[in-house]
């Protein structure tokens, strides 16, 4: 699933290309379950003729700000991508939403697994989407102290907590593994048991893993492409994720893959060992 870096690159590469453009019509919507709100018919009616005024990202949602206070929110889920094409381009069978711009260009929402979602939101709907998600981990407000407050008194294992979009927004399986590796924290550690030093290391690890991925254009393992059709290279720089059976870049121990909260999880058993029960509680 595209995570914060991939969604950010998609939002930026799409927004740069279509800012100021007007949506002439919805050319294709052949998987109506993609549209969460409003009804598919209303979605088509309200979207027609709207101008793209700007763009942003919230959590793993791409936000296209339209005129008259509407926002088109798009979620790529597992296999989605958004690309811009010339007028004569023909969508393939996996393109379930196609928008025709007034200048003739087209926006294709390609989604082989049909998990992608679209919402057309008014100001109240946008506020609700924002409120449903937690802290943005690259924002100035996401300090070490803020992370400590989010983890305090939470007995959940740290990895599923990092994946909880209502707590911290935008982190998925890849960057949870990478952040925990950087911080030398076992993915099953209870969040509340992390020491102050470990919380600081995790804060640094989260931001470093995400910033590295942004600098490398995101991670392309299977489907991810930005809106120019280009993949990322961050997968060439993984330290733990997708490295089962390979040596840890830091200590040389063999990276292990296990399952945590029903998610494949990669970690180093030496660097990320679980410490004794009473030595690491936060002061």
Swiss-Prot record:
InterPro entries from the UniProt entry: DNA_glyclase/AP_lyase_DNA-bd (IPR015886), DNA_glyclase_Znf_dom_DNA_BS (IPR015887), Formamido-pyr_DNA_Glyclase (IPR020629), FPG_cat (IPR012319), MutM-like_N-ter (IPR035937), Ribosomal_uS13-like_H2TH (IPR010979), Znf_DNA_glyclase/AP_lyase (IPR000214), Znf_FPG/IleRS (IPR010663)
Family: Belongs to the FPG family.
Any GO BP: base-excision repair
Superkingdom, natural source: Bacteria
Reaction equation(s) it catalyzes: Hydrolysis of DNA containing ring-opened 7-methylguanine residues, releasing 2,6-diamino-4-hydroxy-5-(N-methyl)formamidopyrimidine; 2'-deoxyribonucleotide-(2'-deoxyribose 5'-phosphate)-2'-deoxyribonucleotide-DNA = a 3'-end 2'-deoxyribonucleotide-(2,3-dehydro-2,3-deoxyribose 5'-phosphate)-DNA + a 5'-end 5'-phospho-2'-deoxyribonucleoside-DNA + H(+)
SMART domains associated with the record: Fapy_DNA_glyco, H2TH
Family annotation (HAMAP family): Fapy_DNA_glycosyl (MF_00103)
NCBIfam families from the UniProt entry: fpg, PRK01103.1
Keywords: DNA damage, DNA repair, DNA-binding, Glycosidase, Hydrolase, Lyase, Metal-binding, Multifunctional enzyme, Zinc, Zinc-finger
Subunit description: Monomer.
Gene Ontology molecular function terms on file: 8-oxo-7,8-dihydroguanine DNA N-glycosylase activity; class I DNA-(apurinic or apyrimidinic site) endonuclease activity; damaged DNA binding; zinc ion binding
Record's cofactor remark: Binds 1 zinc ion per subunit.
Residues engaged in binding DNA: 94, 113, 154
E.C. designation(s): 3.2.2.23, 4.2.99.18
Protein name as it appears in the record: Formamidopyrimidine-DNA glycosylase
PROSITE patterns in UniProt: FPG_CAT, ZF_FPG_1, ZF_FPG_2
């Amino acid at each position: 699933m595209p995570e914060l870096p991939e969604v950010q690159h998609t939002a930026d590469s799409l927004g740069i290309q279509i800012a100021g453009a007007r949506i002439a019509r919805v050319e294709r919507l052949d998987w109506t379950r993609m549209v969460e709100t409003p009804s598919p018919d209303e979605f088509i009616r309200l979207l027609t003729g709207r101008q793209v005024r700007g763009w942003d990202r919230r959590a793993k949602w791409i936000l296209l700000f339209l005129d008259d206070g509407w926002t088109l929110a798009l979620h790529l889920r597992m296999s989605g991508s958004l690309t811009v094409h010339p007028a004569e381009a023909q969508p393939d069978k996996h393109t379930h939403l196609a928008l025709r711009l007034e200048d003739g260009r087209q926006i294709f929402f390609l989604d082989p697994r049909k998990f992608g979602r679209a919402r057309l939101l008014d100001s109240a709907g946008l506020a609700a989407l924002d409120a449903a998600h937690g802290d943005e981990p690259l924002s100035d407000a996401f300090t070490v102290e803020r992370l400590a407050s989010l983890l305090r008194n939470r007995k959940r294992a740290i990895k599923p907590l990092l994946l909880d979009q209502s707590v911290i927004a935008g982190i998925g399986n890849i960057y949870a593994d990478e952040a925990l590796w950087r911080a030398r924290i076992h993915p099953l550690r209870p969040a509340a048991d992390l020491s102050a030093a470990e919380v600081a290391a995790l804060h640094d690890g989260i931001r470093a893993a995400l910033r590295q991925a942004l600098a490398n254009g995101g991670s392309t393992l299977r489907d991810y492409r930005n809106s120019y059709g280009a993949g990322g290279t961050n997968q060439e720089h993984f330290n733990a994720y997708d490295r089962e059976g390979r040596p840890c870049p830091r200590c040389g121990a063999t990276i292990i893959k296990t399952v945590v909260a029903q998610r494949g999880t990669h970690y180093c058993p030496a660097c990320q060992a679980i410490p004794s029960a009473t030595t690491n509680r936060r002061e």
